[in-house]
Every structure is written in C-alpha cells, then in structure tokens.
C-alpha cells in the first residue's frame, strides 16, 4: 500500500483486509555489541520491524566484543569498550574483531548516549514494539 501512495496513478480495488498475527511474540535481535550501529540506523530498523508487524526488539548492548551504552559515572566502559584497534593490553581499546580492523578505524566503534537510548525506547514504544536490552 505504501508503494501505491507514492505512485498517484495507481488504484486499489475496494477490499476489506482482515489481518492478525499467528504468534504473540514476533521478534528480532540486533547485536550492536559486536558491530555498532548508530541511533539513526536503529530507528530505520524499528520502522522495518513495524512494517513487518514485529513486536519485540532485542537490542544487544554489551558483550565481550563491545560496550555500547553510556553509563554515567563509569566513562571507561565507553572510552575503552566502545572502541577497537591494535592494542597490546586493551587499556585504551578492545582488540579488533568482526571486521573492525587493526588500525583503529571507526568501523565498529561507537556507543549510544543515554539520550539516544531513551529516544530509541520512546520511538519503539510509539510503534508498539517492546525493546529488550
């Protein structure tokens, strides 16, 4: 139907659509601990989940491969845990993993601020999607 809205010359026949989900739990998991995606990409994912009528979104924020959420009072979690590159002792960043490269490129680096995470939660809730961090 979205396609037809963009194409003004298209018409739909008069129909009645009855639709209901077969399963009560319809979910998707995005693991940003292993490969970071910024807030705008997560919002795009939520829009797609809404179109597909999924109602649960597991957002993996932490694991051995990365820490992706700001925690006030513990800045070292993001200053070290949200960055990858060559390191001897992992005091300033984590070892390269999952395509991030050994030279400290920005690929795979980053974290969600407290504000970003709240905006994601509100946006998902408005779409009827429950976020499981």
Predicted region positions:
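Feature activates predominantly on carbohydrate-active enzymes
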Residues: 1-133
